[in-house]
Amino acid sequence: RGGAPVGYLSELNQLEQNAILFLRYWSQCAKADHDLQNKFWSNITYDLGITKTRQAIDAFDEIFTLCVKYSRRPIMKHDLECKCIGGDESCFANIIGFAQDGELEDALLLASNLVAPKFASYLVASARKFAASITISECNPLEAEESYYQSYSLH
């Protein structure tokens, strides 16, 4: 049931798309081909810079560990390159989105559908950390030392 298509990645905002892509990547990294892995990490690092990418990875690792250890049932995910999203992925993305927006009760309610209720608050706290690290602030652009991929103009 949690794998039934409920929408498309293109219908989500960037944070929600990234949350689903991270979930898929973490779930499939052992079987994803090397070129696909390099492209995934290159794109994320290019967008965020090295420091924020590391923070996002650490926060997401907490989320994924909670989901693996304490999930109420197996969380269904689509293939890494699939354009549609499943019900569980949608729920997951909404937890991240609600956590970012400070709507913690809504995030907690959805989190308790994915993990055992006593661990839902930990999932929401980790979701807030992930959202903060993966969001690029318009008033706080990447600093030069943060991004290995930053370009420089000579003239």
What does each model-identified segment do?
Residues R1-H155:
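Polar/charged low-complexity regulatory segments
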